[in-house]
Swiss-Prot record:
Its main location: membrane. It catalyses: di-trans,octa-cis-undecaprenyl diphosphate + H2O = di-trans,octa-cis-undecaprenyl phosphate + phosphate + H(+). GO terms for biological process: cell wall organization; peptidoglycan biosynthetic process; regulation of cell shape; response to antibiotic. InterPro entries: UppP (IPR003824). The chain crosses the membrane at residues 1-21, 39-59, 87-107, 111-131, 149-169, 189-209, 218-238, 246-266. It comes from Aliivibrio salmonicida (strain LFI1238). Catalyzes the dephosphorylation of undecaprenyl diphosphate (UPP). Confers resistance to bacitracin. This is Undecaprenyl-diphosphatase. It holds the Pfam family BacA. One of its GO terms (molecular function) is undecaprenyl-diphosphatase activity. It is found in: Cell inner membrane. It is an enzyme of class 3 (hydrolase). GO terms for cellular component: plasma membrane.
Amino acid sequence: MTYFEAFFLALLQGFTEFLPISSSAHLILPSEVLGWSDQGLAFDVAVHVGTLAAVVMYFRKEVVTLLSAWTFSIVKKEHNKESKLAWLIILSTIPAAVCGLMFKDFIEVYLRSAWVIAITTIVFGLLLWWVDKNSTLVKDEYEMTWKKALFLGIAQAAAMIPGTSRSGITITAALYLGFTREAAARFSFLMSIPIITLAGSYLGLKLALSDAIIHFGFLGTGIIVSFISAYICIHFFLKLISSMGMTPFVIYRLLLGTSLLAWLALT
């Protein structure tokens, strides 16, 4: 890996982690299309740390409120809408955590390919477009129920398939349930905090138990660049969807998917 590759991949991770266009697809493509070597376990941990820090920093007020309410619901048995939402975020994390433990190796071996990415990019892009155009979008995140949270959790688990997009499929599921675009995005981003924490911790444990060589310059680049780009991305995404909806991201997914299919057919 070079510093240019580290910068480019971290920028890619930061800009795509929270957009409905699949960060995993964009990180796989450089190795598939450009022939770049795998970025390595340590770099994966670094960009997870950067994007996690970005979403926590952006939603710091909400995170503090939810954590406080959740703590009081346990210690003092005080329950309110914030503690309920915190518990529902935890519930929504369970399906992805379980599926990650059960199917991660299978997905890495059989589904991590450019063909799968091309197809899922197109299919789930069209699904996002259809749901965005045909659903009644009136609910906010505090109208979440345990059944809806579990449904979103199952959607998040399906995002393990490369090209699906974690934010894309969870936002699609939330729109289908009638949540506004802004509420769907906010809940999707809040859902990402525990799952990115779990994924980063798992990768960190693997790194600690491995003999991998750690290049702290690349790690620092990964953390800083992914943090800045993810923070900017979250800010502008939340402003953009209120006026333009999901159409720009659907168009991008269709262009990416069809271009990738064409490239695969010609090589």
